[in-house]
């Protein structure tokens, strides 16, 4: 699908592995109800590691990007089935994250801790 208006042409296309960084950038720039989250957490990758990366890694066939002709500037991601996705998330995605993030040993207090709680308890 191609979207066009004066000065802007973009198309929706299937996600490609080379889009990973651009999708992460979009998530960082829009992760707070359309506002950016850069510098808000201890790492800018926190939100995309929770809300974009697992879908790109586990189910890339259910990911699409809005491409402006230079790079992905938007995305839509999904899963074929939540129970299977959650199982794969726990078995294949979480082990990759444990090198950078640690589960909480107490109830979450800060906004970042609440995000980590979501990460480790999908």
Task: Report each predicted region and the residues it spans.
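Active-site rim helix/loop that mediates acceptor-substrate recognition in acyltransferases
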Residues: 41-63, 69
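Conserved acyl-donor/pantetheine-binding loop and adjacent beta-alpha core of acyl/acetyltransferases
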Residues: 82-122
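Basic/polar N-terminal segments that are highly enriched at the extreme N-terminus
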Residues: 1-10
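Conserved beta-strand in the GNAT
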Residues: 65, 71-80
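A conserved beta-strand-loop-helix scaffold within acyl/acetyltransferase catalytic domains
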Residues: 40, 78-83
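Short strand-connecting beta-turns/loops that link adjacent beta-strands
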Residues: 17-18, 69-71
